[in-house]
């Protein structure tokens, strides 16, 4: 980051990172699609998502004030974490904050805490003026043999904490076939002499904060509006290892032509999601 800026008072800049990933899977029948949705829903339930967000909080050097989480019927999950840049004395923390202490995430709690927390149907994590949230969206259609799973993660911070440093961890935490990342900086802070600062770090692309070995696996496109401190990066996986996209099916059970057809359909689905447009519409089929 280079030399640190000398600021007057608190750093009032708000830095928001929106991270969206898509996992694509081939499931031929409606039954297989439902089984896939059930499987992925269990794999990325609120417990696992909470652990991921707590790790994100740790990586940005923040402290958890409160955690809330919820699994939904028939599928999907949400977790919200409120965080603080600095550890706060217990007397300053609102009594409604659970500090992330609930039985399935933090086993080192006393019996009184466990009794209180066991009565809660949901748990949320919050930061002081900053927060981390995650939501999941499984999806399929009976007329299409491809099911998708979307994860939306938002990290909003104030002060010196930067959410960009957790990108590699987030990408590796999910089966990320398509990734959309948005980063924006809002507000202003001041230098000691009163000069307004609308940005406190150097950036010309979100790619600056993603490891080269990660970028090498994707086709990457940037759309940035520097004057507005808006940065946008889209990533599309380059190689498709078909076995990794088949649900309850071995690739060697399929004839070569079928493998090519499925791979083609997967690629078309990914391109449409990446482009945000119905390029191929429903003119292709893998049934």
Short names for language-model regions:
Residues 1-287:
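Polybasic/polar functional segments that serve as interface/processing modules
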